[in-house]
Amino acid sequence: MTISPPESGEKDKKILESPVKADPRPIDFAKLDKPGFWSSKLSKGPKTTTWIWNLHADAHDFDIHTGDAEEATRKIFSAHFGHLAVIFIWMSAAFFHGARFSNYSGWLADPTHVKPGAQQVWAIVGQEMLNGDLGANYNGIQISSGVFHMWRAWGITNESELMALAIGAVVMAALMLHAGIFHYHKAAPKMEWFQNIESMLNHHIAGLVGLGSLAWAGHCIHIGAPTAALLDAIDAGTPLVINGKEIATIADMPMPHQLCDPQIIAQIFPGLASGTGNFFSLNWLAFSDFLTFKGGLNPVTGSLWMTDVSHHHLAFGVIAIIGGHMYRTNYGIGHSMKEILDSQQGDPILFPAPKGHQGLFEFMAESRHAQLSVNLAMLGSLSILISHHMYAMPPYPYIATDYMTVLGLFTHHMWIGGLFIVGAGAHAGIAMVRDYDPAKHIDNVLDRILKARDALISHLNWVCMWLGFHSFGLYIHNDTMRALGRPQDMFSDSAIQLQPIFAQWVQSIQASAVGTSILAGTAEALPHKAISEVFNGSLVEVGGKVAIAPIPLGTADLMIHHIHAFQIHVTVLILLKGVLYARSSRLIPDKASLGFRFPCDGPGRGGTCQVSSWDHVFLGLFWMYNCLSIVIFHFSWKMQSDVWGLTGGNFSQSAITINGWLRDFLWAQSSQVLTSYGSAISMYGLMFLGAHFIWAFSLMFLFSGRGYWQELFESIVWAHNKLKVAPTIQPRALSITQGRAVGVTHFLVGGIATTWAFFHARLFGLG
């Protein structure tokens, strides 16, 4: 890829003087009528059916459109605004539906008895069957997205506020679309601007993250927390009094702007009306009524305290603003990322790399795929972390007792995390093929890792085999012993125990730490319940349902956790092998010249198929899917058994055999989806069936040979020619890579939608 040369007379200018180029690409609407205008080959139009596949495969591969790194980077930057516009439109739709069609007000008035509903379905051919009784005289479709709980935490108390948000989100979408067009066609940033790493870190960390968190803290403090205090008091049956008036219902609530009146807010949080004098005199304890550190859950709502959440966002915002100013920008002070990396030499004994991290800054700064890979890996890991917060630290009021929402959000964030991490492997492979220059990386950390790849992959392979045989072997042993009627010889909590002693130790030290530490700057100890209740804490009940409870761990957990470890390591093995061998291998030394995706290394070279970096991503997706399926199955059954009290605590004895998983989880819990016809959850029965078909359809692509299809097409074309109705676009069988792409897509979509229907029907069916 080439990099545009600097324009004449601009080499000596500072970046801030001329960061953009005016009118680099005038808007040409004529291009939009020509599919594939960015490719001389595709713009000629279709001659065979392969054209449509190449159009989709290459439309967003900006690298190959012009070969100019600056142009590709501008397209990425512009596409970000387009992405934000789509997000705002999606948010607007959610707000609008909440305002016009949902039962938000009814749910808000009685969240422990009324279920969240999206809309009422019109009766066209019997769809009114789907309108279930959600309480408070509302019949509609039950939802599990958690938006109602989130809106209550924000401080939204009526549909008018939702409609205002819907309008605001549409306006923001229009602004984002305009920004995307403007920053590509009218004022496009130059490459030097994109490469100004320290300024970018300053802007992203201090500006977007820091100020964003601080602004959100402001909303939580002035609107969210006061509204939550009033609503919690109503729900607890002890309404607050404002200006002599009892706030007994939502209709009595002050308007949002009234909560900013010092006279009104002083009656909810006196510290909030005390003015800024306490801030500048460092008397910050005056603010401890609305910036709290209570820990644990609000017993009324079963969620984190809104005042704790406010405190968290304020602290995080301040930390990010300070952290974002660590880097050297215009004033010659602070850290230089290049200097930091170049000075890192690595461990001289464990990992000797004479040139250390030299060259790493340039590679990361110039390779968009390398940047994206790191960001996807981190964001994917963060998404998986968020999954666990859904049950360990429920963030929104009443969400913890809406079991399908907890399970749905856990599952959703798991899938997102898994897809992002596989994406990290994909873009790392592309970076190695397209952006990595071996001549620039001699004896540095990247070079040393590539030289050690055989040791890395062979050891990882050994770990996978060890984990796989041993963890699966425990289940095989238990199934055999149970079949032979020898329960005393099984691995279980009542026979041969395999207790997760390290996990239990972590739980106990978390619980024992409460009340032993001193808060910084005060003489107060950490309050009780300063950690999650799942770590040997206490049970919190809301509306007669368990919101959170200690999660005991035993032999069944140790066994399934080792299955998790096995599957995670196999997924990592596949993805890492795809990256480390992306450019070359013993089998194909010139793999880099074949590109990121190729079917085989030509005829006569047996064993060279399915070795491209793309094929590793393809295989990694299957293992990611298998891995996370077991994770969400484990979570679903464990919570139903040991926390929510829905399956009589059968996890510890049933989950120790394969037969137990098949019989007591999959079969027993699928009764709701299999018997859903004729009820309000019948759509999940149809989805369960249809998604199985989509999944099975994928096998036709994954197991097929191209020759069969091409031969079939030829005979069909012959028949059309005989009838003189032959198409002008010649049919072509899918390439090996295209077939695999279609196969894995339907496999994942079918599998995920099947699980979606299974989970929803189960928990909605139980009520």
Curated annotation (Swiss-Prot):
Expression triggers: Transcription decreases slightly upon iron starvation.
Amino acids binding divinyl chlorophyll a: M700, Y708
UniProt-recorded Gene Ontology molecular function terms: 4 iron, 4 sulfur cluster binding; chlorophyll binding; electron transfer activity; magnesium ion binding; oxidoreductase activity
GO cellular component, one term: photosystem I
Cofactor binding note: PSI electron transfer chain: 5 divinyl chlorophyll a, 1 divinyl chlorophyll a', 2 phylloquinones and 3 4Fe-4S clusters. PSI core antenna: 90 divinyl chlorophyll a, 22 carotenoids, 3 phospholipids and 1 galactolipid. P700 is a divinyl chlorophyll a/divinyl chlorophyll a' dimer, A0 is one or more divinyl chlorophyll a, A1 is one or both phylloquinones and FX is a shared 4Fe-4S iron-sulfur center.
Region (Disordered): 1-22
Binding sites annotated in the UniProt record for divinylchlorophyll a': H692
Keyword Ion transport applies: no
Binding site for phylloquinone: W709
Domain of life (superkingdom): Bacteria
GO biological process: photosynthesis
UniProt feature, compositional bias: Basic and acidic residues: 8-22
Coiled coil: none
Membrane spanning residue stretches: 76-99, 162-185, 201-225, 309-327, 368-391, 407-433, 455-477, 558-576, 616-637, 681-703, 741-761
Subunit organization: The PsaA/B heterodimer binds the P700 divinyl chlorophyll special pair and subsequent electron acceptors. PSI consists of a core antenna complex that captures photons, and an electron transfer chain that converts photonic excitation into a charge separation. The cyanobacterial PSI reaction center is composed of one copy each of PsaA,B,C,D,E,F,I,J,K,L,M and X, and forms trimeric complexes.
Family recorded in the similarity comment: Belongs to the PsaA/PsaB family.
Descriptive protein name: Photosystem I P700 chlorophyll a apoprotein A1
Taxonomy of the source species: Bacteria, Bacillati, Cyanobacteriota, Cyanophyceae, Synechococcales
Encoding gene per record: psaA
